[in-house]
Amino acid sequence: MKKPLGTIAHTRSGDKGDTANIGVIVFKPEHYPIILREVTTARVKAFFGDLVKGEVERFELPNLGAINLLLHESLGGGGTVSLRVDAQGKTFGAALLRMEIEVD
């Protein structure tokens, strides 16, 4: 059954230069394998489309039931030079919660 990622996880996001950072944390430990399967670098890059010019990296944090995503070249140069409304990447996490995933 397809559901938004936000039904099983919450996020925090921010910036480091021109890279957005998104932490995805499951509400329940049994949902961790679902985010590992469904929240892939390819799917995240496709979800954000042209907003992410560089690669997407994923780091797994099983003891926390979380993953950390780095979206390179996604902030228009970074907070001090970007003309984007969200130059610090604070809305990337909220946006990702809308991505449809397959939930067992």
Model-found features: residue ranges?
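Metallocofactor- and cofactor-centric catalytic cores in central/energy metabolism, strongly enriched
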Residues: 2-104
